[in-house]
Every structure is written in structure tokens, then in C-alpha cells.
């Protein structure tokens, strides 16, 4: 049941003395934000000015956090989805005693500061996720709530609740306009994620003007329809109403909560409050002066922090240590009582792989008919999942095709949070951001599957995973025109090139079953960024490794798969399903007396990271007759074949037809390779 609670008239938050202290603390947040934006001559002052009261209540009355140990496992998480209001969280972090100095606040938006324009995970202690692209923080928080729910269901015992925390966030009008928030809110409501509580900064202002220019639906009814617990606070400065709403949300265990707080952007600014001018530019010296006068704040010094306010905020240091120490005592008791579960929990949180985690991964025998690499991927996934409890994920409603289900494991649903198969629905963008949230929470190696073509829907969240260097695995199947009859709407062309262009992303396109197994091993072990597994729909031969280079060399990005007795006349480079064609071409060429070395190149990124000596051993500089083949865009391959080399690929869209007709008509064939090599040698 979804209940609307409207807090319009409430009693004072506390007595007069405490009320004065509250106002002092709130204005401290406001003017640290105003001064930082003004000094940088860049930024967004309006949101922190309006949202300061609700953030203050949350951080000082409800948030369980430890400024001296921002990574304490059972802390509450806070996601500022409205990342443009970054000075709000920077001010809170400094005031509460995190390792973020006043000098860093004064260095807002400057080179190498810990206070970038939008919050960045890893740069600033206390920042739980990078935000800024609106809507993504909303969905990332859903991922954190899924993580909390799973760990709690798996490890908590009666009287031993070692995982019991909330995921809080502040979301904006812009967040709720973005489509990803619809996806994520729908799934969160379905899953009944009661530990998820979002404060909605309902200020009715966007960059272009009032939100009713483009945003007029009833947001509260929308969230109620999603299955959320919905409340409304009519006055963003009513601390008591905000506190009561948060208390009610915390008590609502069966639904995620949205608290719409009617705020005033740029609060206190005589000429900017409740206008678009307050959103994305400094107030200006004159308006800052008027605002300080209006709210009774001293003009000088800038970045002024009253001692009384700082003392009040810094209580978070001692209270945080007490909370953390209490949890540590509880966990020690848990370890004594449940030593095996406790040890597993510690290793899972630390990201440690169990000994022999890969022991069940098979070595696949040679098979001329073979299997699709997506099918092999499903086998390997299950072999790993048996021994790696941190591996958890699912698909955007394509699990039977992506082969992403963990066998003998039921679905993650309300009431079965201990299970590991997540059904994301047809929500690729939301899925990808949720994976980020799970990884950021800690304790997980999350994975998500869909067709490679739909990585377009995932891209913004993949990009944030790369920016944050998160350990996430993307299982992207149906990776070429090999998809066949579904046609060009579903056949990826430019997608591999697009993904390879993204920093910190490793793209793996394995050629056969054993390369697929090695690709999964890499993806599970690699914790320096996300990994793409690009997998075929169609079957590919499983190579006889007694006759070819070992599949373990996948970890070097490219390797000599089939060599010749003497210096090769030509080099043929290929990835994935086209490796078979490269081998066929080499055999044809050999019959005519042309020796061609075949190089399997599943990962450009891994190969580029190798020592130059190794790269030269695979691609000898003196062999200039080079041809690459891949059933996708040719962009980028000339880095390896040279400007005089040839690339056989597709720089146009596909068509609807059976797979063999497509490959033949588009020239993705062994015969095309042979002609290309012969032409280069003749030159």
C-alpha cells in the first residue's frame, strides 16, 4: 500500500536555542557553497542553498557514518544524484570531519583538487559514487540497495544483524525527468527495496525556467504507482517535517521511499531565489552581498565557519567512531558464533577470490562443429559461480539468449534476497547503473547481459564504471551480422569500435570455447575497470590447442595462433568468429606457397599494454603485408596493420538474411582474405 503523507504544519524542530544552532549550521552549508562557486567563478549555488536544510537533518540526525573511516562496511550510503550541487556534499564532508580540508573547498573546480565540479568517486573521501549525468545516481543507489539486501539476507542471523544500513540520496527534478529514473524506480518498487530512501529536491526550476515548461505529471502519483512509499513536505525549511518524514521512511521496510521536499532554489537570494538564474552560475559579488545581509551572515571572511557550528558538526567524528566500534564488537561476536560464515563475509567484502575459484572451469576438447561462445560463456559462468559467491547478476530480459542464469539458483525477488539471479527487465541503462551500485557497495563482482547492439542503451553507465574503475562484467552476445535474420536493427557494426574507444574498458572478443573460458578468468580477476565479453550467436569451432597457440595467451591481448616455419610472407589478424576464416585463408595461401601467420587478437587493450618486445614478436615490423578481418567497423585496425595494410570488415549496416548469405554477400570470407593478402604481396 502506498500512503501519501503531507507535512504542511508541524511544531518547531527543537527549542529556540537549538533552532538557532540549526539555522547557523544550515547557513554555514549555504555560504560555503556560495563562496566556493563565487571563487571558482563556476558552479551551481542554487541547489545547495535550497537543499541545505534537508541535507543537514539527514546527515546530523539519521546518517550512520564514520568520517574517520569512510569505508566502514555497515555505514549508510549517501548518493547525491543531483551531482551539480556538489558543494552541498563537499561542505558536509568538511564540516563533519572527513579528510577534506577547507583549502580544498577554496580550490573548488580547480586542477588536481579533491573538489571537482561534480562528485568523483576515488577523488574525495566520503563520495560513494561519481554523479553528474542526471538520473544515474538514482539507479546506482538502487544497486546499492540490492547489494545491502542480498548481503543481509545471506549473512544476517537472529540477533546478529551485521548488515543493516540505508541508502539515502538527494534527487532532483532533472533526475526524475531522465528515463533511467523511471526504469530504476519501477524495478526498485517491484523488488520492495525498503532500505532505499530518496529526498526529492522539488524546487520546480530547470535551466530553461520553471519545470512546468516540460514536466507537469504528478510525480508523487507516479512513484506511488511504482510501489514506493511517498511523502510530501511543503516547506523545505521545516526541519521537524523533514525529520518526521525520514523517520516514517525508515520504518517502512517493505517499500522504497520518496520524500518530496518543496524547496526554493537559491534560498535567501533576494533576486535569484526561485529563478533559473540561481541554478548554474555564481550569484555575483553584489548578489552574494545581498544574500548574506538577508540571512544575517557576515560579509567577511569568506568561507566563514562559526565555531559553534563546527563543534556541532564534528560530533559526527565521535559518534561515527562509536557506531563503528559497536559494529566491530558485534562482528567479532558473529565471527565467534559463525566462524565459517564470518570468514566468507570478510573475504567477500574485501573482494578476495576463494582459493581454486576457477577449478571447475573446463578445458574444452577440440570440436570442428563447436559451440557459440555465448553458450560456452554460460557454462563457464556457472563453473565460476559455484565457487565465487560474489558473482551476481542477470540480464535485461535476455537470459535464455545471453546464457546468464546461474543454475540451481532462484531469482532475486522480494522475500528471496539471498538469491543471485537478477531479472532486470527490459531496462539496459538501469541495469548497467545498478551494476555500478553493486560494485561500489562492495562484496560483489556484478555482471549484466544483453545483445551487443543494445550497449548503446548502456553506454553512459559503462562510461561511469570506466571513470570509477569499477569491477563490472558485461556479457554482450549476438556480436555481429552473425545474428542473421533479425536484420540491421539488431546487428552491431560500430559497437566494438565505440567500446574500444572508451578509456579503462577492456573489450574481449574470444575466438572459441577455450578463449571464452580465459576471457571469463580475466574478467573475474581484473579489478581495475570493467570488462566487455563480446560473444557470438553462431557456433564457432573449438580449436585443437595441440596444433595452435595456447588459449591462455588471451591475457596478452593478441598472440600467434598459427605460425609458419620461416619468416611469414603475411600476417592475418582476426578476432572472435572471424578467426576461423583467418585459419582457412592461411591454409589456402599455403597451397599456393604463401606463408601467413595467423594472429588471434581478442583484446586491443591488453595487447597495447604488453612490452614492446612482445608486441614485436607477434607483429614483426619487417612483415608489412598485413590484413585484419572482423565483422564490424574497420575503424582502429590500421593501428595494427599499418596504413598500407588492409582491413576486411563492415563500414555499412547489415541486412536481414541467413548468416551465411550475409557473410558471403558482404565479403567477410576466407576468399576475401586470400585476395587481400595476394594483392599486398604483389605490391
Segment roles from a protein language model:
Residues 40, 76-77, 127-130, 160-178, ...:
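A short, small-residue-rich loop immediately preceding and capping a beta-strand
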Residues 110-122, 130, 146, 150-153, ...:
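Thiamine diphosphate
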Residues 80, 169, 178, 198-200, ...:
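General beta-strand structural signal in soluble alpha/beta enzymes
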Residues 98-108, 188-201, 224-228, 465-480, ...:
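A glycine-rich helix N-cap at a beta->alpha junction
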Residues 459, 463, 473-475, 480, ...:
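C-terminal structured domain segments across diverse proteins
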Residues 13-52, 171, 175-176, 197, ...:
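Conserved acidic/glycine
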Residues 50-191, 405-406, 434, 438, ...:
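Cofactor-binding active-site loop characterized by glycine-rich and histidine/acidic residues
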Amino acid at each position: 500500500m502506498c500512503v501519501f503523507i503531507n507535512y504542511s504544519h508541524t511544531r518547531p524542530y527543537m527549542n529556540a536555542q537549538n533552532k538557532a544552532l540549526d539555522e547557523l549550521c544550515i547557513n554555514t552549508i549555504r555560504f560555503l557553497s556560495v563562496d566556493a562557486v563565487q571563487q571558482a567563478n563556476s558552479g551551481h549555488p542554487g541547489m545547495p542553498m535550497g537543499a541545505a536544510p534537508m541535507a543537514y537533518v539527514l546527515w546530523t540526525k539519521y546518517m550512520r557514518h564514520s568520517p574517520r573511516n569512510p569505508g566502514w562496511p555497515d555505514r549508510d550510503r549517501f548518493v547525491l544524484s543531483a551531482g551539480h550541487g556538489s558543494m552541498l556534499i563537499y561542505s558536509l564532508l568538511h564540516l563533519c570531519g572527513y579528510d577534506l580540508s577547507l583549502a580544498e573547498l577554496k580550490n573548488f573546480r580547480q586542477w588536481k583538487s579533491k573538489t571537482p565540479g561534480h562528485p568523483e568517486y576515488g577523488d574525495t573521501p566520503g563520495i560513494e559514487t561519481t554523479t553528474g549525468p542526471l538520473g544515474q545516481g538514482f539507479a546506482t543507489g538502487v544497486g546499492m540497495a540490492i547489494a545491502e539486501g542480498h548481503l543481509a539476507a545471506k549473512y544476517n542471523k537472529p540477533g546478529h544483524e551485521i548488515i543493516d544500513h540505508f541508502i539515502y540520496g538527494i534527487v532532483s527534478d532533472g533526475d526524475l525527468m531522465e528515463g533511467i529514473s523511471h526504469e530504476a524506480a519501477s524495478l526498485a518498487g517491484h523488488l520492495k527495496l525498503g532500505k532505499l530512501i530518496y529526498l526529492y529536491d522539488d524546487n520546480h526550476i530547470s535551466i530553461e525556467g520553471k519545470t512546468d515548461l516540460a514536466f507537469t505529471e504528478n510525480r508523487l502519483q507516479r512513484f506511488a504507482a511504482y510501489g514506493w512509499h511517498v511523502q510530501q513536505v511543503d516547506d523545505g525549511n521545516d526541519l521537524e517535517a523533514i525529520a518526521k518524514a525520514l523517520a516514517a521512511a525508515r520504518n517502512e521496510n517493505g517499500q522504497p521511499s520518496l520524500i518530496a521536499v518543496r524547496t526554493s532554489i537559491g534560498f535567501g537570494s533576494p533576486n535569484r531565489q526561485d529563478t533559473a538564474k540561481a541554478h548554474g552560475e555564481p550569484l555575483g559579488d553584489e548578489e552574494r552581498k545581498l544574500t548574506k545581509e538577508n540571512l544575517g551572515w557576515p560579509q567577511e571572511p569568506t568561507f566563514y565557519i562559526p565555531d559553534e557550528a563546527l563543534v556541532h558538526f564534528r560530533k559526527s567524528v565521535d559518534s561515527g567512531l562509536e557506531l563503528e566500534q559497536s559494529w566491530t564488537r558485534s562482528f567479532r561476536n558473529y565471527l565467534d558464533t559463525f566462524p565459517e560464515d564470518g570468514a566468507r563475509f570478510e573475504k567477500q567484502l574485501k573482494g578476495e577470490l576463494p582459493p581454486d575459484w576457477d577449478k571447475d572451469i573446463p578445458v574444452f576438447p577440440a570440436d570442428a562443429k563447436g559451440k557459440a561462445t555465448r553458450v560456452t560463456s554460460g557454462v563457464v559462468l556457472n563453473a565460476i559461480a559455484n565457487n565465487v559467491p560474489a558473482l551476481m547478476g542477470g540480464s535485461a530480459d535476455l537470459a535464455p539468449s545471453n546464457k546468464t542464469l546461474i543454475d540451481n539458483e532462484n531469482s532475486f525477488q522480494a522475500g528471496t534476497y539471498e538469491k543471485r539471479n537478477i531479472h532486470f527487465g527490459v531496462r539496459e541503462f538501469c541495469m548497467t547503473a545498478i551494476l555500478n551500485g553493486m560494485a561500489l557497495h562492495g562484496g560483489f563482482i556484478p555482471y549484466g547481459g544483453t545483445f551487443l547492439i543494445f550497449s548503446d542503451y548502456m553506454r553512459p553507465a559503462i562510461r561511469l564504471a570506466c571513470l570509477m574503475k569499477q569491477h563490472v562484467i558485461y556479457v554482450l552476445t549476438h556480436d555481429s551480422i552473425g545474428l542473421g535474420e533479425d536484420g540491421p536493427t539488431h546487428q552491431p557494426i560500430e559497437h566494438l569500435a565505440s567500446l574500444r574507444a572508451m578509456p579503462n574498458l577492456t573489450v574481449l572478443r574470444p575466438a572459441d570455447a577455450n578463449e571464452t573460458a580465459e576471457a571469463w578468468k580475466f574478467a573475474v580477476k581484473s579489478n581495475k575497470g570493467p570488462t566487455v565479453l563480446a560473444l557470438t550467436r553462431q557456433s564457432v569451432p573449438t580449436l585443437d590447442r595441440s596444433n595452435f597457440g595456447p588459449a591462455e595467451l588471451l591475457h596478452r591481448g593478441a598472440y600467434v595462433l598459427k605460425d609458419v616455419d620461416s619468416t611469414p610472407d603475411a600476417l592475418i589478424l582476426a578476432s572472435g568468429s572471424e578467426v576461423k576464416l583467418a585459419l582457412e585463408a592461411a591454409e589456402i595461401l599455403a597451397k599456393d606457397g604463401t606463408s601467413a601467420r595467423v594472429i588471434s587478437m581478442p583484446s586491443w587493450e591488453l595487447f597495447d599494454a604488453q612490452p614492446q618486445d612482445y608486441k614485436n614478436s607477434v607483429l614483426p615490423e619487417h612483415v608489412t603485408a598485413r590484413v585484419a578481418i572482423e565483422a564490424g567497423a574497420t575503424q582502429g585496425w590500421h593501428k595494427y596493420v599499418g596504413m598500407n595494410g588492409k582491413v576486411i570488415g563492415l563500414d555499412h549496416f547489415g541486412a536481414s538474411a541467413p548468416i551465411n548469405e550475409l557473410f558471403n554477400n558482404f565479403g567477410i570470407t576466407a576468399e576475401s582474405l586470400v585476395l587481400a593478402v595476394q594483392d599486398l604481396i604483389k605490391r
